[in-house]
């Protein structure tokens, strides 16, 4: 996978291309606008979070290096965890791409700036406050990474993003569990990108791994919101925090066999057209 794949993929005005970079990382292309979400293109977690009890070892290398993204317009981060706001990846992007703007929850602004992003290139993301960007709209949506967390001003630490590209709507949840009010925010979304690795008491309180929605919850959410398609994510990179994707497929066929879905391999792309 290299930059030519992104740049040479031809789209009609009503098409959106999704390129999978691993974990929850995606590049989205619409017309000539390029949006990176949660790019994790290093082994920062392996180097800095590995312990005797929890062994973080990537199951596959990043399909592309951060240096290839000198053309990207916007970089969106959903929260501060290193596999979503990667210091190595973000610092490289800031150096090689002078035009990119970085968007992240306002409470983690100082963290993102510490990776080499200048203040004038940072855009605060606040829940439900629409960002009018070049060629698209971005609507930040609160995410419950097991729970909803806010700072002293009531601003959310964890966000997902609903992105409107022409007539196509895409929701990237970041790390998220179901909470009251989420369904209403996501009605009739064309593509739901949802973390499906689940959660458990032992992971949370013994291994300090904060969880996400289960496969069953993701499928119910898609049905309740009348989603066009589900893209499961956050299930494949680390053995200590993944699931067998066959579980998702089995649940889907049992619970809602008519639901469209796409399961990505790292480096794969898919074109969405309504």
How would you label these PLM feature ranges?
Residues 1-13, 104-167, 253-273:
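Metallo-beta-lactamase
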Residues 3-9, 33-77, 88-92, 148, ...:
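Pre-active-site segment of Zn-dependent metallo-hydrolases
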Residues 11-65, 154-173, 191:
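Conserved beta-strand hairpin/beta-sheet module of binuclear metal-dependent hydrolase folds
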Residues 28, 38, 79, 86, ...:
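Divalent metal-coordination and catalytic microenvironments
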Residues 38-44, 128-130, 135-146, 189-201:
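Conserved catalytic scaffold of divalent metal-dependent phosphoesterases
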Residues 44, 81-85, 109-111, 129-132, ...:
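Active-site environment of divalent metal-dependent phosphoester hydrolases
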Residues 45-49, 63-131:
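Active-site HxH/HxHxD metal-binding segment of metal-dependent hydrolases
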Residues 101, 107, 179-266:
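Cap/insert and terminal regions of metallo-dependent hydrolase folds
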């Amino acid at each position: 996978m290299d930059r030519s794949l992104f740049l040479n993929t031809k789209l009609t005005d009503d098409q959106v291309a999704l390129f999978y970079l691993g974990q929850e990382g995606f590049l989205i292309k619409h017309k000539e606008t390029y949006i990176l979400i949660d790019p994790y293109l290093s082994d920062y977690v392996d180097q800095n979070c590995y312990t005797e009890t929890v062994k973080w070892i990537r199951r596959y290398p990043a399909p592309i290096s951060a240096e290839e993204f000198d053309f990207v317009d916007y970089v969106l981060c959903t929260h501060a965890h290193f596999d979503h706001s990667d210091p190595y990846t973000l610092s490289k992007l800031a150096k090689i791409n002078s035009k990119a703007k970085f968007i992240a929850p306002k409470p983690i602004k100082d963290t993102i700036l510490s990776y080499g992003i200048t203040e004038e290139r940072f855009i605060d993301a606040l829940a439900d406050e629409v960002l009018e960007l070049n060629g698209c709209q971005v609507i930040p949506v609160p995410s419950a990474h097991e729970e909803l967390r806010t700072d002293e001003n009531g601003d959310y630490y964890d966000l997902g993003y609903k992105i409107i590209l022409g007539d196509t709507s895409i929701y990237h949840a970041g790390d998220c569990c179901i909470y009251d009010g989420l369904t209403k925010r996501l009605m009739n979304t064309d593509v739901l990108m949802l973390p499906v690795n689940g959660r458990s008491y032992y992971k949370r309180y013994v291994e300090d791994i904060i969880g996400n929605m289960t496969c069953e919850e993701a499928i119910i959410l898609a049905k309740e919101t009348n989603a066009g398609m589900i893209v499961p994510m956050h299930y494949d990179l680390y053995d200590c925090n993944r699931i067998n994707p066959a579980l998702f497929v089995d649940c889907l066929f049992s619970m809602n066999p008519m639901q469209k879905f796409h399961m990505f391999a790292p480096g794969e792309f898919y074109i969405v057209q309504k």
